[in-house]
Structures are given as C-alpha cells and as structure tokens.
Amino acid sequence: MSGIPGLAGMSSMSPYSAYAALTQHTGVSSGSSPFGSQYCSSVNDFNPYSDPRGSNTWYGMAASANASNDPRMTMSRLMGSAAAAASSSMSAYSGIPTNFHQGMHSAMGMASLGAATYDHQKAAMQFNNMSQRRKRRILFSQAQIYELERRFKQQKYLSAPEREHLANLINLTPTQVKIWFQNHRYKCKRSQKDKEKEQQKEKSYHLKKNIVDDKERSPNKQICNASSSDRSTPEEPVAKAKESGLDFSNHKIDNLNLKMEADLEPKSSLYSIIPPYLTNSYAQQTQSEAQTSPIINNVLGSNLFPERKSTPTMGPLTSYSFGQSMDSISSFYSPDFSLYNCAHPYMAASSSYFMNAASRPWN
C-alpha cells in the first residue's frame, strides 16, 4: 500500500474514510476494482462492515449484559435529550461500519460521564455556597455578657436608639443586641414556667401525703375520741368552737352570770311571793313590833324573818319558838296553809289581826 500515492497518510484514518479516499483517488466505481486480485473486488467482500442492525452481539443479550456492567452506560440517563438525539442519529448511520458505531458509543459514554461529573461538581459548589452563606455563631465575651445582663435587669425591652447605644459600648451590632435580648426573654419565661410547674407538683405531692397520713391515723383518732368523750368537760365544745373560728366568750360570760345569780338566789320562796307592801322597811317595823309580842313572835316570826332560826320546843301554842317553819304548824291553822305560804288572803288578814292584838292584853 505504500506504492499508492496518498495511501500512507490514510493509515491513521478510519476504515470508512480510507475507503472513500481510495475510491476518489483512483476514479473507480465501487462495483469494480482496478487492482485485480490483490485488493478486494467488491464491497461485499468487506464483511466487517456489514449492517450492524442484524448482529446480536451488540443489541442482543450479550450487549445488554455489557451495557449493564459498563458504568458509562448507566450515566447516559443523565444526558436526557442528548441521549435521545444520539439514539435517533444512530438510525441515520445504519450503513456505517461497526467500528464507527463503537467509537460513537464510546464518545457518548464519555460525554455523559463528563456531564454527570459536572453536575456533581455543580451541586457540591452550591452546597458549599449555602454553608458559607450561613452565619457563624457569635461568641460573646464575659464583659459583653455582663453588660447585657445588667441592662436586661434594668430594662427588658430596648428601643432602636438604646440598642444602638448599647451595641457601641460593647462593640456589637444592634442586630446582635436585639437577638440576645429576644433569646434571654424567652429563657426567662421558660424558666418561670418550669418553676411554677415544680411548685404545683410539690403542692400536689404534699396534699396527697397529708391525705394518706390522715387515712392511716383515722382508726387511732376514732379510738381516742371514743375514750375522751366520756371524760369531756363543758369547756371542750368552746375550745373546739374556737378552733373552728367561732367566738363564744360573751356566751360563756352570760352563762356564768346566770349561774352566779342562781347561786345567790335565796333558798326560801318567801321573798318571791310576798306582796309589795311587805318590803324591807315594813319587815323591820314588823320585826320591832313582833319582838314585844310573844304570840306574833312565835306564830309569824318564822315567816317574816326566815334568816333567824331556832330549835322548836314542845308545848302549847305559846311554846313555838321564833323562826319555826310554818310547815310544822300548817295543820294547826289550815290544810292549805303550807300551800299558799302566807300568800293566802285569810292568812294576810290573820297576820294583821295578830299585829293589832299586840297592843291589847293577852288572857
């Protein structure tokens, strides 16, 4: 082939290009060969350049297995429309030799691989840009935190000029001061809510504990109450009432006064039933007159002057001593004498008769 001019340069070309150049140079049609038996006489002798659509080596099972194992073919799905265009162009080059098709597929696989690599690099760059755009956490110094907390205790909400002034003092931006105050207010509210919840839990716990203790001590209380009810004093209800918040001091004093009046009341019912005209002055006058008359002294002395007591003596009517009870002589005068106890009108008349008789001589 070296004797043919221009054929040496064709060795580096593809077989299809070399064949076309050779035909154009010799001016011979594809149906005959000018070189005799040394070269191929017809196109049909180029068996390697037969129609690739009928071969099962590329489109059959073996080809599908090779395609599944080839990483370049798996990346072709990322090409999208480019892969569809390449597949459509394959039908146009159906008469092209198999080596050309293999080169085209290799080029398509490399292109798809490069496109996928570019997409991954682009996604990584976007992620890096997003991470760079995210603001870093700012760490405050101890002096800045101290100044912020001191101002927060004085004022929980700051206006825009106040934030700007405070930010200039501690070398921060007004936005940083604003965010710090917002976070600190939220923390304070949350801590306050947690504290209230803990207090409620403690109260409920103590309440339940007291209820349980009362239930455990209730049998002992019933036994103690049953034993102490027999030895209870009148002052215990008052003490219990004081514990319940009631005041019975005035009521107790009134009861005490009534008891004292009842104790001071005389045992004899004479002063409660004598008429109004039998007063102290009248009784003193009658006593002075009765001392001069032995009959009045013996008969009426015990009723008019009950405080004077003496032992009765046996004998006639005149032998009754002063201060003798009228009950002892009630049967002598009238069966109703002891019932009326000197309140009967006949007894009042008889007493006046005896008093008038004191001035007359007695037979």
UniProtKB/Swiss-Prot annotation:
InterPro entries on file: HD, HD_metazoa, Homeobox_CS, Homeobox_NK-like, Homeodomain-like_sf
Gene Ontology MF term list: DNA-binding transcription factor activity, RNA polymerase II-specific; RNA polymerase II cis-regulatory region sequence-specific DNA binding
Location relative to the cell: Nucleus
Region listing for Disordered, in residue ranges: 189-246
Tissue: Intestine and unidentified peripheral parenchymal cells. Slightly higher levels in the cephalic region compared to other body regions.
DNA-binding region: 133-192
UniProt main location, coarse: nucleus
Keyword terms, alphabetized: Developmental protein, DNA-binding, Homeobox, Nucleus
Keyword DNA-binding: yes
Pfam family, one: Homeodomain
Family in the record: Belongs to the NK-2 homeobox family.
Protein name: Homeobox protein DTH-2
Organism of this sequence: Girardia tigrina
Gene behind this protein: DTH-2
